[in-house]
Amino acid sequence: MEFVDEAELQKAAEEPEDEVRGRIVLVGEPMGLFIAEELGELEDVTHFSAAVAGAEYNVAVGLSRLDHEALYCTRLGDDPVGKTHFKEHERQPRFRRTCDRDGHGFDRFMMKGRTEAGDPKIAYFRRNSAASQISTHDIDKLDLYGCDFLHVTGIFPAVSKSALDAVKRLMSRAKALDMFISFDPNLRPQLWKDEKEMVRTLNSLAQEADLVLPGLSEAKFSQSVTRRRVLRSFTTSAA
């Protein structure tokens, strides 16, 4: 057990508010999020509220609010969803967005149901999004000077072959620069061709990370054979 040094806590409290605590790089696919305002199947719901979503985007926002500088690599389409994301990025402190605005690609979205018990129903509409076109060329253009950490999830690599290659290149560049790499499996079986490909790919990425972070729901005993197998694989590789 580690004990907290009160002097260190006092020092942290006295740090200037504008001081950057760390620079973290993320890459991902932002989406529009339509949240049901009433119970029932998604096809029966008539009222939704709109928001922005994306696992990596959410992490980037949280980090920026904690005085870390988040460098979020993505690609936004020239459409209402992309424009909404762009405006949200501008509102966040210490949030740096990089990569291109895509005048030809479109941003995708997801629908989230409302429930009184259990997990809500989710429907994805994300094939061929603007962000899925991110390439190794985009990654090679990134200025990683002064960056301390790279955070990767298992979602973006499932979006497209180009996205997977981009993530691999980014992890390779980060390792070469001695950046600390964290990896959140964020299992999304519905995005993969099959279980075998998901297990093989995510396990390969996990082995390149310094820290693997399965979520609480993934770590708990699950009825999903897919999740248990992937988690066992991560545990084995980390041992």
List each language-model region with its residue ranges.
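Conserved phosphate/ATP/ADP-binding segment of small-molecule kinases
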Residues: 177, 191-239
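Anion (oxyanion) recognition and catalysis
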Residues: 64, 90, 168, 172-176, ...
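Conserved N-terminal subdomain of the carbohydrate kinase-like
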Residues: 69-154
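Short beta-strand/loop segments at the ligand-binding rim of alpha/beta enzyme cores
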Residues: 178-185
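Glycine-rich phosphate/adenosyl-contacting loop at the front of the ribokinase-like
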Residues: 2-95
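Active-site beta-loop-alpha junctions enriched in small/polar residues
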Residues: 127, 155, 186-190, 217
